[in-house]
Amino acid sequence: GVIHGLRSFVPVMLAQGDECHIVNTASVAGLLSPPGMAIYTVSKHSVVTLTECLHQDLVTRTDLVRASVLCPAYVPTGIADSERNRPAELRNAPKALTPEDVAREEALRHAVNSGRITAENVADMVFEAVRDGRFYILTHPKIKAAIETRMQDILLERDPTDTFKPKAATKG
């Protein structure tokens, strides 16, 4: 998807000599490393890194073509229910879930479904970010704390923190 798009469009954008902007869509999972989502997360990290490299390559060649990476968090798009579209013969066998797995999935589903940011809001954010010249486009500012925690884990060479772990309910 993303690689083929870049191979098709970047040469045309460079040749036309007009201002252009590429926005690749990843996910906040491309900046974090949540458990239970390895395949999805790896693909999103790849999009982020590819776009970072693309940015570096473009700035050495031209001032006219730029790139940004969109990393949305909880936007109710129906992605959590995408398994329903997979043909029966290609579906994965159900896996046994631990109570922690169930809690994590419920918390994630709740966060997505209760998201106050619509796809239309995200589109507006993208146009604003392109106008402002921002590379990373984060739809949910509160997620920056989790990103900062991950960066600190790396810099301090410590085990990764599960920033997606559901918070324990408090009595009050």
Q: Predicted segments — roles?
A:
Residues 27:
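Residue(s) in the substrate-gating loop at a strand-loop-helix junction
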Residues 6, 43:
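Active-site helix of classical SDR
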Residues 34-39:
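Active-site loop immediately N-terminal to the catalytic Tyr-X3-Lys motif
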Residues 154-172:
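Non-catalytic terminal and boundary segments that flank Rossmann-like NAD(P)-dependent oxidoreductase
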